[in-house]
Amino acid sequence: MVEENHTMKNEFILTGFTDHPELKTLLFVVFFAIYLITVVGNISLVALIFTHCRLHTPMYIFLGNLALVDSCCACAITPKMLENFFSEGKRISLYECAVQFYFLCTVETADCFLLAAVAYDRYVAICNPLQYHIMMSKKLCIQMTTGAFIAGNLHSMIHVGLVFRLVFCGLNHINHFYCDTLPLYRLSCVDPFINELVLFIFSGSVQVFTIGSVLISYLYILLTIFRMKSKEGRAKAFSTCASHFSSVSLFYGSIFFLYIRPNLLEEGGNDIPAAILFTIVVPLLNPFIYSLRNKEVISVLRKILLKIKSQGSVNK
């Protein structure tokens, strides 16, 4: 009987959104549109950076990887969420949960380190422009990017491995729209203290290191900007950093609320708005934040549009 109960509770029901038929249809359309825009926007930015030699610099390599990470985040969460709007059971197995969280944790941890790498790149470009190619070499850029993804994989392996020490024998309703670790911990019949402690330590360490790197970089950047005598130089430096800082604020604000706050295991209705911001809104906005405020990207886009327009005129 114990074995039967244990097996039965290896399947869960996601109950994060409304069951109202009209609202379900509306939400499906909205989130499907967001999903398409997110994937197309981010993949387009990756393709733009990959295909134009002018953008093969450390900053754009980091931005390209951030765009790739954001598209992976959308692909890890949204398809199952859209399926559940019209699925009667809204069921997800423990193994599906583990896979979904593994990919989400990997890409979001990589995101943290990539954002810190972009901050360091901006620090070198603004505070030490003459030494930029020495301090921010292509080799270092590749090492930082590779390290971000390795750290993401290791971080997710730890948490996914610890999920399988838990036993689920009570309610199997997850009050969320995707399978995160905290909602699973709330359903565990085994005390999840170790899981919660490891989550707090490792997620906290990642946050402290990456946020610390971002803040220190921006502190030096601000000090350098205020010392600039040229108004044009100051405006250009502010413009360069504004888009990155906007993305950092949205991303870290939501992730801090989700994983670093006290009383993590309290019932998670309040998790959903922050999770929507973290997993859906931020990946949607990032390609527009990075491209629309970036003169290099806009310049390349204009050249592409002019080329397409001129080719169209010739064909006519």
Swiss-Prot record:
Disulphides: 97-189
Glycosylation sites: 5
A single GO molecular function term of this UniProt record: olfactory receptor activity
Topological region Extracellular: 1-25, 76-99, 161-196, 259-271
Cell compartment(s), UniProt: Cell membrane
Topology with respect to the bilayer: Multi-pass membrane protein
A Pfam match: 7tm_4
Record keywords: Cell membrane, Disulfide bond, G-protein coupled receptor, Glycoprotein, Membrane, Olfaction, Receptor, Sensory transduction, Transducer, Transmembrane, Transmembrane helix
Transmembrane region(s): 26-46, 55-75, 100-120, 140-160, 197-217, 238-258, 272-292
Biological role: Odorant receptor.
PANTHER family tied to this protein: OLFACTORY RECEPTOR
Protein name: Olfactory receptor 5K2
Species this chain originates from: Homo sapiens
Gene (UniProt): OR5K2
